[in-house]
A protein has these predicted regions:
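A residue-level marker of the well-folded mature domains of exported/periplasmic proteins
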Residues: 20-384
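Positively charged n-region of N-terminal signal peptides that target proteins for export
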Residues: 1-9
Length: 384
């Protein structure tokens, strides 16, 4: 009996040892857990990214100009395309053959609206003619960016900003350059109340925003510059006149009766008849043309000419003005920057299409003279 009990106890001990051994061998099993990790996160999700990219549309932005035939608009188009390339958007630049073809421009814009653009850049020939289109843009949430003359008088709320020249700032450049002319400065320093010096601005009207802005910009800056050399009086047109008795420097604003070339020339002749005239700023291409007619197409300004000592500056460009600058008959001229007008118009349109808040951009202006007129950047800006 004792032997039987001993045998049973031995069997129990063996079974216990076997069970303990099995548990000890199973302990490392958790180390296998990391092997399951790759199964926990399928790799299929990232494959959706290319599909999302395929769904993303390239922004389409029509750029509708007031014209297309002049070099000015070609420079605007070049700037527009440069911005489109930089921002990765598609544009279509177009304009009517003439800046009098309002109906043609409206038709062009309507065709582009049918393509559901994400934004529209517009230099309107007639704001009232595109009123319905502007209302449609406002209703559909298509932001409109004005450029050059923009979309003046818009009431739809569709126009979010404008890329254009600040005419006051641009014309002020001419006044600053007059202040750098040694001969003119010497005349201002030597002037007296009995023998004043006269600096004139010749404008074709006192109504249009661009011409008025340039006239104001020149007068204000010229007063600032001239005040360093004497007492200044602004005379001529009532809109700008601020007459001061005993002035040594007179800034005269001459506005022609009409914008016709003959009337501008008559105003130029009236200025040229004043013996104390020392300098003239012509505020646009039209007044430059009229003034040049009064000085034998510029030859009277040449060395040995009747008005060889007269300091003259213009605005914009054109073949006749460029020739006067290149010959040195003009001290220089101010040109707008049509390349930047186009570039900034598209840049603003892209930002507005992406829901960003935008505001007006001054596209700047450049001074050109006989020394830099053929520089690569200036030559792009000064059209014929």
């Amino acid at each position: 009996m004792k032997k039987l009990i001993a045998l049973l106890l031995a069997l129990v001990m063996v079974v216990g040892l076997v069970a303990c051994g099995a548990k000890e061998e199973a302990a490392p099993a958790p180390e296998a857990a990391p092997e399951a990790a790759p199964e926990a996160a399928p790799e299929a999700a990232p494959e959706a990214a290319p599909e999302a990219e395929a769904e993303a549309e390239t922004l389409y932005i029509p750029v509708m100009a007031k014209g297309f035939q002049h070099q000015f608009w070609q420079a605007v188009a070049a700037g527009s395309q440069a911005a489109a390339d930089e921002y990765g958007v598609e544009i279509y630049f177009d304009g009517p053959a003439s800046e009098t073809e309002i109906a043609a421009q409206v038709n062009m814009i309507e065709q582009e609206m049918a393509k559901n653009p994400k934004a529209l850049a517009l230099a309107a020939l007639d704001t009232s003619a595109v009123a319905d289109i502007l209302d449609e843009c406002a209703e559909k949430g298509i932001p409109v960016i004005g450029f050059d003359s923009g979309v003046p008088g818009d009431t739809s709320g569709a126009v979010k900003a404008t890329a254009c020249t600040n005419n006051e700032n641009a014309a002020a450049i001419a006044a600053e350059k007059f202040g750098e002319n040694a001969d003119l400065v010497a005349k201002m320093q030597a002037a007296t109340a009995d023998a004043p010096v006269r600096i004139a601005v010749l404008s074709q009207d006192a109504v249009s925003a661009s011409v008025c802005g340039r006239t104001t910009g020149f007068v204000n800056k010229m007063v600032e510059v001239a005040s360093a050399y004497g007492t200044v009086s602004v005379e001529g047109h009532d809109k700008w006149a601020n007459k001061v008795d005993g002035a040594t420097i007179i800034i005269e604003v001459a506005v022609s009766a009409t914008t016709e070339a003959v009337d501008v020339q008559n105003s130029a002749n009236a200025l040229l008849a004043k013996a104390d005239l020392a300098a003239v700023f012509c505020s646009n291409e039209g007044t430059v043309t009229g003034f040049l007619s009064a000085v034998s197409d510029g030859e009277d300004l040449a060395d040995g000419g009747k008005y060889e000592d007269l300091v003259v500056a213009g605005f914009d460009a054109g073949a006749a003005q460029k020739n006067a600058v290149r010959q040195g008959w003009f001290y220089g001229s101010v040109t707008q920057d049509p390349y930047q007008i186009g570039y900034q118009a598209v840049a603003l349109a892209v930002a507005a299409a992406n829901g960003e808040t935008v505001s007006d951009v001054d596209t700047g202006a450049q001074w050109y003279n006989a020394e830099n007129i053929d520089d690569e950047m200036i030559s792009l800006l000064v059209y014929d």
